[in-house]
Amino acid sequence: MAAYPESCVDTTVLDFVADLSLASPRRPLLCDFAPGVSLGDPALALREGRPRRMARFEEGDPEEEECEVDQGDGEEEEEEERGRGVSLLGRPKRKRVITYAQRQAANIRERKRMFNLNEAFDQLRRKVPTFAYEKRLSRIETLRLAIVYISFMTELLESCEKKESG
C-alpha cells in the first residue's frame, strides 16, 4: 500500500469495497452515498463496519428498499462493544440454546467415547513390552513405545527375510 497516496486508500474506501463485494447482481448496490459527500469527508464515521452516511442494507423487495441516513444512538454501539457478535449484515448472531436433555445426552456420548479410548490404550499397553516394575504408562508414552516396538519388529522381519533369500 505504500505506493498509493494515503488519501486514496483509507478504511472508508476499503469498507465500501467490502460492502460492494457482498452485493448481488440482481439487487441494487447495498447502499448509496448521501449527495455531496466525498470519500475523504471525515464525517464518515464508522459504525458497524460501514460509514454512518451510508445507508444500512435491509433484506426485502429491491423496489421497496430506501436508503436512509443511519443516525443511530450510542446505546446500540455500547451493546455491540460489550461482546455481542454481529454478522456481516448487521444482525446479531443467534446463540445456540442447548436443553438439559441434549447436554445429558452429550455427556453420555463423551463418557462412552472416553471409556472406549481408555480401553484401547489399555489393550495397547498389554501388547507393548515394558518393564514389570514400571508404573502405568501415560498415553503419549504408550504411543511412543508402540512406535519404537513396531519399528524394531519391522526391522527384525526384514533382516530375517534377507537371510532367507540370500
UniProtKB/Swiss-Prot annotation:
Ranges annotated as biased composition (Acidic residues): 60-80
Gene Ontology terms: biological process: cell development; developmental process; floor plate development; negative regulation of DNA-templated transcription; regulation of dopaminergic neuron differentiation; regulation of neurogenesis; regulation of transcription by RNA polymerase II
Plastid keyword on record: no
Alphabetic keyword roster: DNA-binding, Nucleus, Repressor, Transcription, Transcription regulation
Stretches assigned to the bHLH domain: 101-153
Region Disordered, residue ranges: 57-88
Subcellular location: Nucleus
Any Pfam family hit: HLH
GO cellular component: chromatin; nucleus
GO MF, any single term: sequence-specific double-stranded DNA binding
Main localisation: nucleus
Function: Transcription factor that binds to the E-box and functions as inhibitor of transcription. DNA binding requires dimerization with an E protein. Inhibits transcription activation by ASCL1/MASH1 by sequestering E proteins.
Subunit relationships: Heterodimer with TCF3/E12. Interacts with the bHLH domain of TCF3/E12.
Name this polypeptide is given: Fer3-like protein
Species lineage: Eukaryota, Metazoa, Chordata, Craniata, Vertebrata
